[in-house]
């Protein structure tokens, strides 16, 4: 009677929605593993699960007075994590055929993300052979019974969804000791819980996800600021997005690729959202690529209109670009202000009240944005991402990293770069964190000052950028940082060590590619391995393809929800080339993306980058990693910059060339270091060329195309070469 009454009350108050197959609970041995977001979770499961389970409750809670009142209505087993016999008792309950509910996190989430997973629940599942049914509870975290005060906007009676995920099992891992087996089982259960979160993520477009974040965190919550230091709330950003969308549709058509040549600024974020909600596809142009690069991008993606700013062109010394790329229809944001009519203002006002009505019909799988590869190894390619692939990557990041609305992101990497767009804009926007957009990562003195001034807690960049920030920063500038993430190039040991010594901060290295939106793997506080790029993100499938001549690792191929829709190439303008890769048997399989990177995956799944297939030189039949040549030079001269390339050689096929900013490096010094490091002499270049600075791309990566051309050029000055 009481059970029925409470179920009716909760159904009316919280509009409980049940998703998933309830028939799967008829297993003989059953372990139910829900996430834990509020004090309501146990009551919700007791009322709405299709079976009557036994709850495993920590003894510190089961001994409290209110649990005595619940005892006649809810079966529970006290669980003392300090006593191994308690785990054995739980296994016996399952073996008797009684379904058991265990909260693997052991506590209510204080971040909104998954907390640490205790291995006890995994050991119970593996030892008993029970079927695991993951359950997701969404919405209860917004109630006053959650522990997210100040993180989410509290609501008394939000809608709560309970999702039953497909059943799975967890075999006992093979290991030498019981402790190791238990730890491995816990890691497997963590993977199951992360997969459950990913499978229940909402299917939205970018604009719908933005509106959902606006509702979740509050429309007046501070959201985004730029170098003007004027901070916009979610409502302020919505207003600007609606204004851009209204005007943009006058000179563009639906499904058109609209070029955007804009700096890191609030208006750029508004332009992306504004174009998206009216079915225009922003094509983020690299303003460091020059006229030739812009023309290549325009040809590949069929871009006719470029949105930019006169002020930006003047400050960036790019005023000649419109003349050099005269075939484009250049639209200046400053000129649009005078074109706003009364009808436009009324339209914007109406849709501020009813923002969902502003969006034209579109689906999550529709194209959302065009990014361009760095061009470090050839012509830049247009990479088309859907709404879903971008938001899937955001959710993958949020599943492994505990970002919250308390965080403040310093976003200096350009928004035309996938790293800057997804990690620097979309992730904090969908998390409720505040964003500070800065127009250049190259201002090595200013960025640390702004990190300090804005109380930033999250900073990301390339190894080169982070190393230079460390040079000019005061030891206290980074005192509030929780996450410092390095990507886009290998993290140098010098940079890693200086951050540890000067600031007491561990840099977390990650790995991504534009085609994967971009994050593929990342080290996080919960799972870190030094000199690796971390674990692959949840829901990403991987395989390694053997490459002849390369004995260590294999060529990494990926499949997952964050993979691009396809390429737009200069050679085949306007035609979308869907991702496909050859498997080990040489069969072309759709949906797989070949990264071209040689990696190793250890027994726990940590990924270590060996190098790119294209960054190997073949010397007399032997494959030599150009990155290993660079690392050898770094050990000899850690303060200088080094980049290796290959050149044609009539006797060996190819020969190594080392470009360095250290004029004192000689082959003899490199040979001595190679012998002490166990590096073969074949990997020591004879051609060593001093340069004042390495050619770099806008992302901070070395420009390997230019370096290859430089390597092929004959050495005209004897001082440029040593052997």
Curated annotation (Swiss-Prot):
<feature type="transmembrane region" description="Helical">
    <location>
        <begin position="258"/>
        <end position="277"/>
    </location>
</feature>
<comment type="similarity">
    <text>In the N-terminal section; belongs to the 2-acyl-GPE acetyltransferase family.</text>
</comment>
<dbReference type="GO" id="GO:0005886">
    <property type="term" value="C:plasma membrane"/>
</dbReference>
<dbReference type="GO" id="GO:0006631">
    <property type="term" value="P:fatty acid metabolic process"/>
</dbReference>
<keyword id="KW-0808">Transferase</keyword>
<feature type="region of interest" description="AMP-binding">
    <location>
        <begin position="233"/>
        <end position="646"/>
    </location>
</feature>
<keyword id="KW-0997">Cell inner membrane</keyword>
<keyword id="KW-0547">Nucleotide-binding</keyword>
<dbReference type="InterPro" id="IPR042099">
    <property type="entry name" value="ANL_N_sf"/>
</dbReference>
<keyword id="KW-0472">Membrane</keyword>
<dbReference type="Pfam" id="PF01553">
    <property type="entry name" value="Acyltransferase"/>
</dbReference>
<comment type="function">
    <text>Plays a role in lysophospholipid acylation. Transfers fatty acids to the 1-position via an enzyme-bound acyl-ACP intermediate in the presence of ATP and magnesium. Its physiological function is to regenerate phosphatidylethanolamine from 2-acyl-glycero-3-phosphoethanolamine (2-acyl-GPE) formed by transacylation reactions or degradation by phospholipase A1.</text>
</comment>
<dbReference type="Pfam" id="PF00501">
    <property type="entry name" value="AMP-binding"/>
</dbReference>
<dbReference type="GO" id="GO:0008654">
    <property type="term" value="P:phospholipid biosynthetic process"/>
</dbReference>
<dbReference type="InterPro" id="IPR045851">
    <property type="entry name" value="AMP-bd_C_sf"/>
</dbReference>
<keyword id="KW-0012">Acyltransferase</keyword>
<keyword id="KW-0436">Ligase</keyword>
<protein>
    <recommendedName>
        <fullName>Bifunctional protein Aas</fullName>
        <ecNumber>2.3.1.40</ecNumber>
        <ecNumber>6.2.1.20</ecNumber>
    </recommendedName>
</protein>
<feature type="region of interest" description="Acyltransferase">
    <location>
        <begin position="15"/>
        <end position="138"/>
    </location>
</feature>
<dbReference type="GO" id="GO:0008779">
    <property type="term" value="F:acyl-[acyl-carrier-protein]-phospholipid O-acyltransferase activity"/>
</dbReference>
<feature type="transmembrane region" description="Helical">
    <location>
        <begin position="409"/>
        <end position="433"/>
    </location>
</feature>
<dbReference type="InterPro" id="IPR002123">
    <property type="entry name" value="Plipid/glycerol_acylTrfase"/>
</dbReference>
<keyword id="KW-1133">Transmembrane helix</keyword>
<keyword id="KW-0511">Multifunctional enzyme</keyword>
<keyword id="KW-0067">ATP-binding</keyword>
<dbReference type="InterPro" id="IPR023775">
    <property type="entry name" value="Aas"/>
</dbReference>
<dbReference type="InterPro" id="IPR000873">
    <property type="entry name" value="AMP-dep_synth/lig_dom"/>
</dbReference>
<keyword id="KW-1003">Cell membrane</keyword>
<feature type="active site">
    <location>
        <position position="36"/>
    </location>
</feature>
<comment type="similarity">
    <text>In the C-terminal section; belongs to the ATP-dependent AMP-binding enzyme family.</text>
</comment>
<dbReference type="GO" id="GO:0031956">
    <property type="term" value="F:medium-chain fatty acid-CoA ligase activity"/>
</dbReference>
<keyword id="KW-0812">Transmembrane</keyword>
<dbReference type="InterPro" id="IPR020845">
    <property type="entry name" value="AMP-binding_CS"/>
</dbReference>
<dbReference type="GO" id="GO:0005524">
    <property type="term" value="F:ATP binding"/>
</dbReference>
<dbReference type="GO" id="GO:0008922">
    <property type="term" value="F:long-chain fatty acid [acyl-carrier-protein] ligase activity"/>
</dbReference>
């Amino acid at each position: 009677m009481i059970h029925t009454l409470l179920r009716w009350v909760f159904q009316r108050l919280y509009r409980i929605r049940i998703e998933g197959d309830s028939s799967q609970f008829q297993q003989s041995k059953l372990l139910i593993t829900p996430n834990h977001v509020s004090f309501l979770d146990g009551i919700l499961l007791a009322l709405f699960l299709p079976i009557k389970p036994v709850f495993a409750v920590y003894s510190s809670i089961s001994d409290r007075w209110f649990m005595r009142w619940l005892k006649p209505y809810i079966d529970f087993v006290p669980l003392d994590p300090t006593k191994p016999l308690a785990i054995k008792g739980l296994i016996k309950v399952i073996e008797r055929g009684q379904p058991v509910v265990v909260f693997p996190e052991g506590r209510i989430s204080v971040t909104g993300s998954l907390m640490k997973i205790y291995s006890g629940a995994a050991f119970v599942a593996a030892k008993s052979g029970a079927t695991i049914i993951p359950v997701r509870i969404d919405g209860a975290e917004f109630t006053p019974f959650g522990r997210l005060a100040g993180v989410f906007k509290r609501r008394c009676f939000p809608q709560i969804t309970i999702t039953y995920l497909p059943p799975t099992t967890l075999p006992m891992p093979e290991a030498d000791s019981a402790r190791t087996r238990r730890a491995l089982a816990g890691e497997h259960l963590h993977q199951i819980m992360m997969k459950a979160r990913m499978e229940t993520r909402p299917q939205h477009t970018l604009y719908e996800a933005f509106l959902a974040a606006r509702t979740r965190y509050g429309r007046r919550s501070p959201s985004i600021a730029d170098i003007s230091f004027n901070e916009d709330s979610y409502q302020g950003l919505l207003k600007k997005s609606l204004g851009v969308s209204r005007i943009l549709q006058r000179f563009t058509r639906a499904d058109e690729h609209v070029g955007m040549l804009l700096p890191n600024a609030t208006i750029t974020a508004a332009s992306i959202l504004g174009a998206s909600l009216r079915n225009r596809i922003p094509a983020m142009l690299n303003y460091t690529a020059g006229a030739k690069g812009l023309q290549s991008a325009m040809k590949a993606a069929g871009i006719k209109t470029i949105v930019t700013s006169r002020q930006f062109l003047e400050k960036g010394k790019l005023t000649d670009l419109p003349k050099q790329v005269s075939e484009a229809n250049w639209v200046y944001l400053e000129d649009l202000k005078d074109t706003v009519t009364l009808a436009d203002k009324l339209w914007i006002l109406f849709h501020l009240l009813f923002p969902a009505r502003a969006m034209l019909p579109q689906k999550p799988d529709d194209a959302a944005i065009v990014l361009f590869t760095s061009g470090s190894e050839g012509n830049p390619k247009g990479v088309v991402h859907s709404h879903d692939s971008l938001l899937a990557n955001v959710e993958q990041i949020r599943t492994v990293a505990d970002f919250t609305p308390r965080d403040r992101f310093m976003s200096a990497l350009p928004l035309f770069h996938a790293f800057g767009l997804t990690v620097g804009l979309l992730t904090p926007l969908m998390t409720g964190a505040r964003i500070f957009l800065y127009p250049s990562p190259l201002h090595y003195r200013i960025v640390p000052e702004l990190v300090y001034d804005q109380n930033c807690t999250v900073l990301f960049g390339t190894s080169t950028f982070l190393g230079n920030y460390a040079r000019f920063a005061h030891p206290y500038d980074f005192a509030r940082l929780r996450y410092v993430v390095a990507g886009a190039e290998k993290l140098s040991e010098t940079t890693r060590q200086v951050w540890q010594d000067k600031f007491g901060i561990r840099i977390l290295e990650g790995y991504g590619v534009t085609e994967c939106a971009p994050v593929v793997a990342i080290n996080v506080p919960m799972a870190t391995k030094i000199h690796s790029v971390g674990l692959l993100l949840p829901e990403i499938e991987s395989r390694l393809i053997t490459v002849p001549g390369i004995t260590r690792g294999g060529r990494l191929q990926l499949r997952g929800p964050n993979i691009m829709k396809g390429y737009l190439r200069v050679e085949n303008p306007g035609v979308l080339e869907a991702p496909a890769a050859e498997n080990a048997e040489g069969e072309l399989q759709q949906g797989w993306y070949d990264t071209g990177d040689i990696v190793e995956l250890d027994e726990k799944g940590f990924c270590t980058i060996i190098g790119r297939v294209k960054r190997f030189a073949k010397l007399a039949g032997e494959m030599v990693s150009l990155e290993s040549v660079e690392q050898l030079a770094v050990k000899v001269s850690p303060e200088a910059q080094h980049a290796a390339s290959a050149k044609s050689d009539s006797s060996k096929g190819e020969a190594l060339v080392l470009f360095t900013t250290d004029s004192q490096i000689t082959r003899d010094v490199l040979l001595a270091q190679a012998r002490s490091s166990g590096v073969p002499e074949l990997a020591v270049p004879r051609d060593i060329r001093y340069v004042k600075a390495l050619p770099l791309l806008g992302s901070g990566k070395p420009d390997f195309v230019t370096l290859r051309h430089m390597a092929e050029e004959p050495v005209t000055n004897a001082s440029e070469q040593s052997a």
